[in-house]
A protein has these predicted regions:
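Divalent-cation
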Residues: 2-249, 253-279
Length: 279
């Protein structure tokens, strides 16, 4: 079945001028280019999650067909593919084809990344700082969520932009490890700095980053009121303070939780939550 679906997916990609076909399957598919189209597979953790979700039953749904249709067409599969493309650095302005072949679901879908939540978030945040900064911090956050440090899960936060106002509303908890270093070695868009960021993510507090990507501080404690924030229940102090600082300044915050989620805040609102376990 997968071979047939993949063939149809490639033909469809040609028709809609897509440069990529994303395969969601428990089976192995070699990453390759075919007729100029990149073919690659999503992590098996997602196809397993898709199957597990599809086997759920309850009065809320009128059978498996409605559940699967809602799941694929309206939320997870399309958003997942768009987010995966973003993390891989693939910017698709045209439609993207997804080929799904699992124990419970088989089909081909067309995804419009430009209408996805991740792209809407990128576009909205890019009004305030370089999109490269946003992409770099999200990729670092994904690494922190996946790897932690020395086998230990970590949580941390990044506050980006409006540095002067953010510094006024925060204090240094420990000696700032980035103070006095040249800007070049503090630029978060340079992969050579990421190891240092991973190391200092163990510090309490958050990173402060300017709109060009220069890391101004690590281990910074945000001092703002968190009352009247309209956020989901159960969030910890780091999430609340990082959300609140975006309400009082023009900054944007990205928070990595110890549970592995990545949250983005702007103007006191939560723009997106990314579950990193399926990437």
């Amino acid at each position: 079945m997968l071979k047939l679906l993949l063939k149809e997916g490639i033909e469809l990609a040609k028709k809609v001028n897509s440069k990529a076909v994303v395969v969601i399957s428990n089976q192995e598919v070699e990453e390759r280019r075919e007729d100029g189209i990149l073919i690659f597979t999503a992590p098996k953790s997602y196809s397993m999650a898709l199957d597990a979700f599809s086997h759920m039953e309850g009065d809320e749904y009128e059978g498996r067909k409605k559940l699967v249709d809602k799941f694929i067409k309206f939320s997870h599969a399309g958003e997942y593919i768009s987010t995966m493309l973003y993390f891989r650095g693939i910017r698709e302005e045209e439609a993207v084809v997804g080929v799904i072949s699992t124990e419970s679901i088989n089909g081909v879908i067309i995804v419009d990344p430009e209408r996805s939540e991740i792209q809407k978030t990128v576009d909205e945040c890019s009004e305030r700082f370089d999109p490269k900064v946003f992409r770099s911090i999200l990729n670092i956050s994904l690494n922190i969520a996946h790897k932690g440090r020395e086998g230990r899960r970590l949580g941390t936060g990044f506050v980006i932009g409006d540095v002067d106002e953010v510094l006024k509303r925060s204090t240094q908890m420990v000696l700032n490890p980035f103070e006095g270093h040249p800007k070049k070695v503090r630029n978060i868009t340079e992969p050579s700095t990421w190891e240092s960021v991973m190391e200092f993510a163990q510090l309490d507090g958050v990173f402060i980053v300017d709109k060009q990507g220069t890391i101004m501080a690590a281990g910074r404690y945000i001092e703002v009121h968190t009352k009247e924030l309209k956020l989901r229940q159960g969030l910890g102090g780091r999430h609340l303070s990082c959300a609140a600082i975006t309400r009082e300044t023009e900054a944007v915050s990205i928070v990595v939780s110890e549970s592995g989620d990545i949250s983005v805040y702007k103007d006191g609102d939560e723009l997106i939550v990314i579950n990193t376990h399926i990437f």
